[in-house]
Each structure stands twice: as structure tokens, then as C-alpha cells.
Amino acid sequence: MRTLRGRFLALLVAGLATGIAANAASAEAPPADNGHNVILVTLDGVRVQEFFGGMDPVLAKAPEAQSGIYDAEVTSKRWWRETPEARREALMPFVWKTLAPAGIVLGNQAKGSKVTVRNDQWFSYPGYSEILTGQAQPDVKSNDLVRYPHRTVLEYARDSLALSPTQVAQVGSWDGFKYAASSKDGAFFMSGARDPVPAALSTPEIDLYNGLRQQIQQLWEESSNDVLSYRIGIEYLKKHRPRVMWLGLGQSDDWAHARRYDLVLDYLHLADGLIAELWQTLQSMDEYRGRTTLIITTDHGRGRTPADWAEHDAGIPGCQDIWIAILGPKTPALGEAHDFPDVTQGDVAATMLQYLGLDGRDFNAKARPPVPRSLKTE
């Protein structure tokens, strides 16, 4: 009996030890890479009014001194339609005719879908920080071009999936984007408003677009032309096949601050076309087709009235209201969200990670959860 009991105890201890070792190895092992890709596109300071309703009837009727519309007849002919649905389809046809039927569009409060920022600043850097870290960061209170010690979803994805520095990328038209993208210099490929692309990573096309980007005059020193930034991003994507990429576009905010509502509308149509081309490019490449999610959002809203629509800060109602659009093979085709749980800007980070097979809680315990119902259930 003692011999059998001793053998039993020895086997039991050995089994427990094996189980503990296996659990420890499992806990230490990196998550399985599901091979999915995520592309984040941000359009700076785009209001819910235009995104969901096209040309705003309030601003369409406002005096030129408030709207900045240079030729009301021309602008109305381009963008005015009788219904909000017709106006938004004319303004952003890819979003409303391609993305919305196959994906999710959130933020139309008239239909019971609310997306808001949680930071208390309501301008750019705090918004991008909230998007990329999953939470409002109390110490981010300016647009100063500095890095903060908050790990971003881009850094976490690279580390967790053991991606190379070229497989995570940020390309944008404002220098603030490259600072918001990472807590550390050189964590992955980052390109600001006029940064030259290193020769080892560049192509003749990238060199051409970057040279033009240096020459074209912009409204603000810290920004560059969105079309050229987009072209650099597309060429980088074709050459290096990043798994995670953030493309930051900013001229929507530039034209709004210049109080040129007509040019804001023209720009949104242009940006929609660029995003459509991006999606078509992704579908033409084996590495991306059927395995890529596109997420589009904005950093803040703007004022709601003719007097304050051009501006944004914590004292202007409406600047907290934003939107999110998602398209991809893992996203259910919910369309324009109706009677939907409230969503915040910080939900974007964990939403990106869920498509990559990662858990936002491991990234940042204080991060917001993913957008509800944004992942297909098998």
C-alpha cells in the first residue's frame, strides 16, 4: 500500500508540476498572430454635421462673413441636396455607398448613436492621444510637439506581434502626428509633415512626392499637403506592407480654421476619394485583401453655430461630438448605427487590437473596451 501510495503521490506531483510549467509557458508565450492588418485613417476636426448630413443648412444660409463661402451658387450646386442622406452621399460617396452598407458607422445622435471624446481639451493632440492610448490622458493639455510617456496601440501591436520597425507605420500631414504615435523616438516608421523618408525605405515615387511636399505652401508651418502625404503613405504601403498603419490627414481642420466652409466641403469630397482609392488598393493586394480592417475617425468636433463652427476648444459646445466608421471582413454589416450603446474616442485602441487578435486590457488596464458589436461572432 505504501509503495502504491508513494507512486501515486509521485505521479500526482509530477502531473501538477507539468501542468504548472505548461501554464507558465502559456502565460509567457506571445499571442498567436492571426495575420490580420489594421489601417487607421484620421480626418482632423470633421464635424458630425457634415459627416452625417453633408452641407449644413445652418451654414448654407449664414452670411459670407461667417461661412466664408466665396460663391454660394457654385457651392450649393456642388453640395446641396434636399435631404441629409442625399447631401452626405454627394459629399462622401465612398463612406455612404460602400463602407456604410458593409460596415459600421457610429455617431449620428439623431438615430441614437453617440460618440464623444473623454478628454477635457477638445483639440488635436489630446484627441489623438486618447485614440491611440485608449483613454484620456490628463497631462496632454497642448498641441506642443513633444512625446508623452504613454505607450500607444501602435507600439503595443509591434511589440506583441514581434513586428519589424517597417511593419508599423505612421504617415501624416502634421508634425504632431508623429509625436502622438509613439512614446519613443524610432519605435517604428514615423513621418511628419515634411520629414524626408530614409533612402533605405524610400522609392523614386516617395522621393518625388516628398520633394513636392517641401515646396507647396501651406496655411500652417507644421502641416503639409494631404494629397502628397497620402501618396507617400500609399507608396510606403505598397513597398513595405505594414501590418498596422496610421494615416493622418489634416487639411479639413486647416480650411475650417481659415473659415472657408466651401473649401471644407470640397476637401471632404477629396478625402473620401482618397480613402476609396486606399480601400481599392488594399483589395488589389494579396497581403491585404480579405484580411484588413479600415477604421476612420476624427480627433474632435467643432462648434455648431455660424459664429463658432470654425473653432474648437473645451468652451465650445459640439466639439466633444465625433464619429467612427469601420469596414473589414471581421466587422458585421450593421450599417449606420441606431439605438446603439454610447461609444467614446478611447474605444478605438482596443477595437484595433481586437482585429489583430490582441486584448486591450493587456495593452492598458485603464483603456476603454472595444466598440460594442464591432467583431463578428463565429
List where the protein language model places each region.
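Histidine-centered active-site microenvironments of extracellular/periplasmic hydrolases
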Residues: 62, 296-329
